[in-house]
Curated annotation (Swiss-Prot):
Its EC number is 5.3.2.6. The lineage of its organism: Bacteria, Pseudomonadati, Pseudomonadota. Catalyzes the ketonization of 2-hydroxymuconate stereoselectively to yield 2-oxo-3-hexenedioate. Belongs to the 4-oxalocrotonate tautomerase family. Pathway: Xenobiotic degradation; toluene degradation. It catalyses: (2Z,4E)-2-hydroxyhexa-2,4-dienedioate = (3E)-2-oxohex-3-enedioate. Keywords: Aromatic hydrocarbons catabolism, Isomerase, Plasmid. InterPro entries: 4-OT (IPR018191), 4-OT-like_dom (IPR004370), Tautomerase/MIF_sf (IPR014347). This is 2-hydroxymuconate tautomerase. It comes from the Bacteria.
Length: 63
């Protein structure tokens, strides 16, 4: 069972996360020749101040 664990900065809509899940699942199923119904996708949303970019919190880097 292929599993993808994705970490994203909070703030995406439910629709965007649904699209992400669908597209990642399809890509994994196609590239691994796995049944789509066996693919799992886990999304962990991170607060901007818990995510670093270039040594700085994303809350300071991304506005």
């Amino acid at each position: 069972m292929p599993i993808a664990q994705l970490y994203i900065i909070e703030g995406r809509t439910d629709e965007q996360k649904e699209t992400l899940i669908r597209q990642v699942s399809e890509a994994m199923a196609n590239s691994l020749d796995a049944p789509l119904e066996r693919v799992r996708v886990l999304i962990t949303e991170m607060p901007k101040n818990h995510f670093g970019i270039g040594g700085e919190p994303a809350s300071k880097v991304r506005r």
